Amino acid sequence: MAKRKNKELLEIAQEIGGEEAVEVVKALEKMKEATDEELAEATGIRVNTVRRILYMLNDEGLADFKRIRDPETGWYYYYWRLETKKLPEIIRSRKMAELKKLKEMLEEETSEIYYWCGTEGHPKLTFDEAMEYEFQCPICGKMLMQYDNTHIIEELKRRIEELEIELGLKKKPRKTSKKKKSRSE
């Protein structure tokens, strides 16, 4: 698997199920195909957790299985493998969802004026909420001041533009170079 695809697969695994999911994916990459018990043994992760991770990967379209019945016991064994053919579509879909969420956050940040007491961990309040509390923090009682969210807005805009370029929805801006004046001018 190409390094970039592998990196993106591991990032998605991390989002889905944390470090344990990353370990399961790495083990499955090495083994190509394995049962949940084999993966549990290879990773040291409990079988129930491995199964949960495999089902989550399957729900995302990143893992698939084949079911084989043991003729002697009648039990079914599930052999799991990674399914990366749809990885580019999955990545694009996740990025589109992130883009939508960022645009909603930007809309929220630009459509409201927020107030805050300045204490880390205390809530930002909208104008209406600040009015309800008579411009005093509901936690510490300090006076609420208008919150400068320009850094948040700029970061959201930057990330939105970055995603739009990655997704091919927007062209990368060209760097403008300053023209040197000729001596004849």
UniProtKB/Swiss-Prot annotation:
Q: Which InterPro entries match?
A: TF_E_archaea (IPR016481), TFE (IPR039997), TFIIE/TFIIEa_HTH (IPR017919), TFIIE_asu (IPR002853), TFIIEa/SarR/Rpc3_HTH_dom (IPR024550), WH-like_DNA-bd_sf (IPR036388), WH_DNA-bd_sf (IPR036390)
Q: Which NCBIfam families match?
A: PRK06266.1, transcription factor E
- Protein name per Swiss-Prot or TrEMBL: Transcription factor E
Has keyword Transcription? yes
GO terms, molecular function: DNA binding
Q: What is the lineage of its organism?
A: Archaea, Methanobacteriati, Methanobacteriota, Thermococci, Thermococcales
Q: Note the subunit structure.
A: Monomer. Interaction with RNA polymerase subunits RpoF and RpoE is necessary for Tfe stimulatory transcription activity. Able to interact with Tbp and RNA polymerase in the absence of DNA promoter. Interacts both with the preinitiation and elongation complexes.
The encoding gene: tfe
Name the protein family: Belongs to the TFE family.
Q: Which Gene3D superfamilies match?
A: Winged helix-like DNA-binding domain superfamily/Winged helix DNA-binding domain
The protein's role, per its UniProt record: Transcription factor that plays a role in the activation of archaeal genes transcribed by RNA polymerase. Facilitates transcription initiation by enhancing TATA-box recognition by TATA-box-binding protein (Tbp), and transcription factor B (Tfb) and RNA polymerase recruitment. Not absolutely required for transcription in vitro, but particularly important in cases where Tbp or Tfb function is not optimal. It dynamically alters the nucleic acid-binding properties of RNA polymerases by stabilizing the initiation complex and destabilizing elongation complexes.
